[in-house]
Amino acid sequence: AFIWGGYSAFALTAVFSLILWWGLILSSLATPEGELFTEKMDRLHRSAYQLQVSEDGTRLKIQGEITFGFSNNFLQALKDHPGLKTIVLNSQGGHIYEARGAAKSIQDKGLNTHASRECSSACTLLFVAGRKRSLAPGAKIGFHQYALSFGNSLPNLDLQKEQEKDLAFFQSQGVKLPFLNRMFQHSSKTLWYPEYQELIDSGFLNSPN
């Protein structure tokens, strides 16, 4: 099982589980000739998001779900475009582990982050990893508790500890404690959208629009 940080995860994972189950039986019906099942699933995952580089090569736009394989493809995009300076985000979230991998790449390379419309749940890990963090007018940032993609519990996985791990990362990026204490108060079925001034005062945003 995997940890998801996107409020659309419940519906999406239900659909995904059906795709996976039927795909094992009927994959040949919708699979190009010669395509392996693993290749098909990678293609489906890639279709959930877009990575688009600006004409001048300085901005990489991420749009869609942060899903399986995302962090590797994101890192490859960074390698292919060494002139990138800013990551532009529009995502409702997705897979926490994939988001952590991408966030580390952003932090290591000292890239800036900018939310163009919405950056919620797992997407906020990418956002807070930025050196300079800004928000477009009307854009929003959303937070909620983590949830499992399948089932309600796993014996070796503590969601509270996973949240604490990411809270420590947020704090290391300059986000203040009162804000951190509110980040995971909402259930995984709802979202907390802080006001713009709250984001500024907390240190979550640190650059003008």
Question: What do these predicted ranges mean?
Answer:
Residues 3-33:
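Transmembrane alpha-helices and immediately adjacent membrane-cytoplasm interface residues
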Residues 41-73:
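STAS-typified acidic loop motif
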Residues 53-62, 83-86, 145-151:
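Acidic/histidine-rich, surface-exposed loop or edge segments in extracytoplasmic proteins
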Residues 62, 87, 127, 199:
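Terminal peptide-recognition signature
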Residues 71-78, 99-103, 107, 124, ...:
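Extracytoplasmic/secreted envelope proteins and their assembly/folding machinery
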Residues 83-98, 112-118:
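Short, glycine-/small-residue-enriched flexible loop/hinge segments at domain edges that mediate gating
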Residues 107, 111-147:
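Glycine-rich beta-to-alpha active-site loop
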Residues 149-209:
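Charged, glycine-interspersed solvent-exposed loop segments at helix/strand-loop junctions
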